[in-house]
């Protein structure tokens, strides 16, 4: 089963996440099929905190990929941010 989820990168006390498409059997930070965006929760600049490729997310949803709960929340947040701009 293919999932859209967050992979943890960064260093100690400085988390950085990549939103990726990966097989559910792969480890959290292991192999992935495609990178869809990134999320930096400790960024000082509001514009660079969250970047996503919505076209590719819709493509993978159409292929049957399941989205993790946290990824769904971030996609909704990104959509709100895009609507206000």
Curated annotation (Swiss-Prot):
Keyword vocabulary terms for this entry: Ribonucleoprotein, Ribosomal protein
The organism is Buchnera aphidicola subsp. Schizaphis graminum (strain Sg)
Pfam families registered for this protein in UniProt: Ribosomal_S16 (PF00886)
Q: Please give the family membership noted in the entry.
A: Belongs to the bacterial ribosomal protein bS16 family.
**Ribonucleoprotein: present as a keyword of the record?**
yes
GO MF? structural constituent of ribosome
One GO BP on record is: translation
**InterPro entries (alphabetical):** Ribosomal_bS16 (IPR000307), Ribosomal_bS16_dom_sf (IPR023803)
- Tree of life domain: Bacteria
**Is-annotated flag, keyword Ribonucleoprotein?**
yes
Name of the featured protein: Small ribosomal subunit protein bS16
Gene Ontology annotations for the cellular component aspect, listed alphabetically: cytoplasm; small ribosomal subunit
- Gene, per the UniProt record: rpsP
